[in-house]
Amino acid sequence: SDPFENQTADASDAGLLSPEGLPSNPFEFLNHLNNASNAPIVVLPMLHGPLGEDGTIQGLLEVIDVPYVGSGVLGSAAAMDKSFAKTMITAAGIAAPRHITMKNPVLTDLTDIGDRVADELGFPCFVKPANMGSSVGVSRVDQPELLSAAISEALSFDSTILIEEAIHGREIEVAILGNDDP
């Protein structure tokens, strides 16, 4: 018999399912979870950006021995750094859009950067911060003269940026929830 069959919880159960009254700081929230007398059976992290998508929360959940669903610490951390993720993907032989990674680019060298992008990637291209969640700081650049603004935007989020060729086609995202015996 399944001990969790027909088990339910609602938002009034110690406020654990409701953000009201809970700490907004992820570390304080995890401390709250660790000390709760009726801690959840499993956490479904639905967080965005640094601390939420980079493996930090997953690592802290592991430290306090609270199970969670989704990607683990290593997968989350590796995917958050777009430059590192591309290195891993291409090393595994998986095709990925061509890209240029730039650390602390100097905006006075924009002519050189624009020439390099035109030669190696072409336009349109995408400029994005290396470490940001979702599409935060991402710009589509259709013409070389728009590159400066896109680089400035990406640099406002991270000192390392990626400039990536545009790929035409469908984008498909797949979330997988499973176990060792799918």
List PLM regions with ranges.
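ATP-binding N-terminal substructure of ATP-dependent carboxylate-amine bond-forming enzymes
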Residues: S1-V69, V73-L74, A78-F84, M88-A91, ...
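Anionic group-transfer/hydrolysis microenvironments
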Residues: L47-P50, I100, A130, A166-I167, ...
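Residue-level detector of flexible, active-site-proximal loop/helix-junction positions
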Residues: P50, G75, K103-V106, G133, ...
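Residue-level detector of anion-binding/catalytic polar loops
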Residues: P67, A95, T160
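ATP-grasp fold ATP-binding core
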Residues: I89-T90, V117-V138, S159-H168, I172
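Glycine-rich phosphate-binding loop of ATP-grasp-fold ATP-dependent ligases
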Residues: A96-T101, C125-S152, E171-E173
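Charged helix-capping and loop-helix junction motifs
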Residues: T111-R116, R140, P144
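Phosphate-binding site of ATP-dependent enzymes
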Residues: D142-P182
